[in-house]
Design a protein with these regions (language model features):
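Iron-sulfur cluster-binding electron-transfer modules in prokaryotic oxidoreductases
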Residues: 1-204
Length: 204
């Protein structure tokens, strides 16, 4: 019953497809009397939170980073910070968490539970560079230019000398992984979702 939120369709300009997908989702969610939605993807988080209400789909929307922060604060998750304490980790801000929803401190708070060696990229937070996948760009051919965005962003990572990139978006994960492969750095630098780092820190 679960289907795409319609975010890629709307970003690509196919409003009819977006509304069809959105209304189908709202019908299913309302049939289960859903009040709260926990999202993994920032694109889904943004569209459920900020755009579905215009179509009658009003829910409490929580991103999993917020959920993890609360679980850590309440002592529900016990993290062994020795596993990554000396590992140099940088964080890539997903556009739909950062720019669209001003969620900058929450992922960094999670990371501070994992490592003492966190390093910011020069372009971070409000100045962070997109990974290149947003706005449905992931589903189309690259436009003409001197360099693709995912390569530019990977070069930002390399300047930090980090051995782990952390992010919180499946689109960003794909683009950063591709960037590491393009630069032949996939053996030296690993790409993790924040939830994966937490899981490994808990020896799960």
């Amino acid at each position: 019953e679960e289907r795409c939120t319609g975010d890629p369709a709307r970003r690509a300009g196919n409003e009819m497809l977006f509304q069809m997908q959105a209304f189908q989702n709202i019908e299913v969610l309302n049939s289960y009397n859903v009040k709260k939605i926990l999202t993994i993807c920032p694109h889904c988080y943004n569209i459920f939170k900020n755009e579905y209400p215009d179509l009658g789909g009003t829910y409490e929307v929580v991103n999993y980073i917020e959920f993890l922060n609360k679980a850590i604060d309440k002592g529900l998750l016990t993290i062994d910070n020795k596993k990554f304490e000396s590992v140099r980790i940088t964080y890539h801000d997903p556009c739909y968490l950062g720019r669209a929803n001003n969620m900058y401190s929450e992922p960094r708070t999670v990371l501070k539970h994992v490592t003492r060696n966190f390093v910011e990229m020069d372009r971070c937070k409000t100045n962070a560079l997109c990974c290149g996948a947003g706005g449905a760009q992931m589903f189309k051919e690259a436009e003409e230019g001197q360099k693709e965005i995912f390569i530019e962003r990977t070069e930002d990572v390399l300047k930090t000398n980090a051995t782990i990139i952390a992010t919180a978006c499946p689109f960003c994960m794909t683009m950063m992984t591709d960037g590491l492969k393009y630069k032949n750095k996939e053996e030296e630098i690993k790409n993790y979702d924040l939830a994966e780092l937490i899981a490994e820190s808990m020896n799960l």
